[in-house]
């Protein structure tokens, strides 16, 4: 046929059997990739430290999606929360991966069968004897089946009625676990951070899908609508399907980047806005203040801060700090976190407590500035020492650590104080192992960043694909250059004057 590469899909345009075949093969490729990728990630994943080296620090991409749906155990004898298990059951990480690969193989065989046996009776229009598809009826079938799946997921899997539930955590990502979720039918169900909304929305959307599917199965479209929307053209199906996919991609890019109950920070890492707003820092200070109110010492109050909470309050876990084209996991960037050194408290020689200004997200370098409780600059690390007024040496800044590995340790040596002031710009201070993975010290993004970038990019491409194919199907006659009156115009004797539709002959 000699088709150019960008037109090869025309071979299935009027061939329902092989159109079905290539879609089954596509499903085989997707399921095969998912299963294979899961096995690869399981081969390189280290489950030993879920607090300082969680899945998102290691660059895991498919493991978080399995986990949020209720998979927590491995045939390797470990649990995602750090415990050991003896009976992981069939639906472990490996079990799910294996199921995808088996399903992929079955789809592969089915695709070959449908490619060979393409000329089936079911695809033939009995009136014309030619291959054709009843697209409105197929739309109704798909809508009904997807509605059943959607309803079933919300009513059974998420609620734990027949299934494990989903991953649910607290607002600070500390106590996450898989548990059943009750549907939220009130206004709170519209809060994107309320897990109950996942159950109720799936139940509601599934019910709507079932009813809409039954409607489209029992009611034929009006002729004008059928012709106006080109419902008999397979390219209409392609166009509207692309629209559904790009819309979904835009939505999930938003829920991933801005955060929601469907994208827990324990599985995908924190969002950039949690750093920008000092979200974890405020919670840490609230807990310390509560401890001091209970007559705890500063050291005791800081020692009770969970290491997990302190680790979230570190700029290296901000997905917007890694460049989009820096390959590798977060661990390949700043290293594997080993331990929290503690919270540094800086004071000048007058005993006034100073706070290091934190680095904003989109800065690579930032001046080291220490301010007091009123926001007045009291110390800095100057660019030009000759003009300095607030240098660490001049102001006499010291640092003391509370909580963590350096609890109770203080330093007055200016070089050491400046070192910790620079590190305090980046949030809580952690000891990082760069040797194991030969980490280069350049921040990387988390799976949250990759997912958002990928889905936003493809959504944009698919948006243009929708416009393209929608235009092609709506204006097919214009693009093809076929005028509906063309037959009459060139028919001998149709007009008194050849090609002039105003002189049409009247039949006697």
Curated annotation (Swiss-Prot):
Keyword Thylakoid: yes
Keyword Nucleotidyltransferase: no
Annotated localization: Plastid, Chloroplast thylakoid membrane
Encoding gene per record: psbB
GO cellular component, one term: photosystem II
MF terms (GO), sorted A to Z: chlorophyll binding; electron transporter, transferring electrons within the cyclic electron transport pathway of photosynthesis activity
Protein name as it appears in the record: Photosystem II CP47 reaction center protein
Cofactor comment: Binds multiple chlorophylls. PSII binds additional chlorophylls, carotenoids and specific lipids.
Keywords: Chlorophyll, Chloroplast, Chromophore, Membrane, Photosynthesis, Photosystem II, Plastid, Thylakoid, Transmembrane, Transmembrane helix
The species this protein was found in: Lepidium virginicum
Gene3D superfamilies found in the cross-reference section: Photosystem II CP47 reaction center protein
Role description: One of the components of the core complex of photosystem II (PSII). It binds chlorophyll and helps catalyze the primary light-induced photochemical processes of PSII. PSII is a light-driven water:plastoquinone oxidoreductase, using light energy to abstract electrons from H(2)O, generating O(2) and a proton gradient subsequently used for ATP formation.
Membrane topology: Multi-pass membrane protein
GO annotation, biological process: photosynthetic electron transport in photosystem II
NCBIfam families: PS_II_CP47
Transmembrane region(s): 21-36, 101-115, 140-156, 203-218, 237-252, 457-472
Subunit structure: PSII is composed of 1 copy each of membrane proteins PsbA, PsbB, PsbC, PsbD, PsbE, PsbF, PsbH, PsbI, PsbJ, PsbK, PsbL, PsbM, PsbT, PsbX, PsbY, PsbZ, Psb30/Ycf12, at least 3 peripheral proteins of the oxygen-evolving complex and a large number of cofactors. It forms dimeric complexes.
SUPFAM superfamilies, sorted: Photosystem II antenna protein-like
Family recorded in the similarity comment: Belongs to the PsbB/PsbC family. PsbB subfamily.
InterPro entries attached to this UniProt entry: PS_antenna-like, PS_II_antenna-like_sf, PSII_PsbB
